[in-house]
Amino acid sequence: MPKQTLTVAWISDFPVEWLPDLPEALRAWPRRHPATWQMVLLSELEKDPALRVHVILLRHRLERAFCFERNRTVFHVLKAAPWLRVASVFWADTLLIRRVCRRIGPDLVHAWGMEKGAPLIAHRLGRPYVMTVQGLFGWYRERVPLGRYDRFIERLERVSLRRAPVVTTESDYAVRYLKARYPQLRIQQAEHAPNQAFFQVRRQPQVQPIRFISIGTLSFRKGTDLLFRALERLRAELAFTLEVISGPNRQYLASLRPTVSEALWQQVEFKHHLLPAEVAKELERPTLMLLPTRADVSPNAVKECVVAGVPVVASSIGGVPDYVAAGRNGLLFPPGDLEGFLAAIRTAVQHPLFGRGQVDAATLAQSRDYLSPARMARNFLAAYQAALSPAAGQSPSR
């Protein structure tokens, strides 16, 4: 008998704006966070003829709901006002998504991240579901001050984690954190893989002057202030340039600018809204990647650099040590420690490999295998099967 097709509905803030061949009606939308890991997994799952994925997302820049198909995946773009979504604790989302699910009849729902209430919605639908942790807001609250919206999401996260049938998360640290606080959880570790372009980077490191690169959100949590404070101190010691790849955050940069000298500012180049292939291209020349983050579960920027062969100097926090093997493909320092960050940069610059923009070859091969898109797909398929098993129907808390 032919194998039955498994239909999966993703509830996701999917970065549809980044797709290369969008329908005309959607092309003028501004780009959000690229969430490249979702596109990587989707590309892998689209290779499986026994799997059918529907991506359901909500936007407010629409005249009406919109549906289109690409590479066997159907995208359902629904219209909803942001204020109504939050004010209703995502019940507005639930009602809209429930209508779509009644029409497509998914075997399974995949709730991507807590940021827009996806696990709450999935639970309300009454179908088997998987919850994917993209950021651990409870842990963030322990590490850094949270804004009002993130505090709201952190409370919803606690509810969702108490009753999710199957949860996926990335790093060993995240697995340990969740098991310690939610012992009833069924957890499937599934690393989010970088885009294939990062595995194909042809490195030509620039070492005179040293070329630093920083990738990620500009924020206190990501340690942007520590980055500039450290480089201000190093200006008299080292000849360097800094490339910052991020989404624009004019408000944060304006608050940071008075603390940065004009001389250092002239050494910095900002680049925004780059496609994954463009970011991969930018990784050809850096000597070192710098990430002084204060709280990160599994930073995608570190994974991208690790599989590209860029040495990483990063804080030893969350899942970062899963990807940065000290002395082999980078160096670690205590989070929030400016002096430790400075010492790590100085050591890396003098390192026989890192100072030339190189990493240990065996470690590079291991990283590429561990973070491969194919492995990611296998792990998520295992999570789907776990959610469809009879044991998953016995939800830990209703």
Functional labels for PLM-detected ranges:
Residues 9-11, 168, 204-222, 228-231, ...:
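Conserved donor-binding/catalytic core segment of Leloir-type glycosyltransferases
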Residues 148-167:
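Membrane-proximal helix-turn-helix segments that form the acceptor-binding/catalytic region
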Residues 173, 193:
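Carbohydrate-associated surface elements
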Residues 215, 241-255, 272-273:
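Glycosyltransferase donor-sugar binding loop
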Residues 254-274:
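Nucleotide-activated donor-binding/catalytic signature segment of Leloir-type glycosyltransferases, i.e.
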Residues 288, 311-314:
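Short hydrophobic beta-strand element within catalytic cores of glycosyltransferases
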Residues 294:
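Aromatic "clamp/platform" in nucleotide-sugar-dependent glycosyltransferases that forms part
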Residues 326-327, 331-338, 348-353:
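Conserved acidic donor-binding segment of nucleotide-sugar-dependent glycosyltransferases
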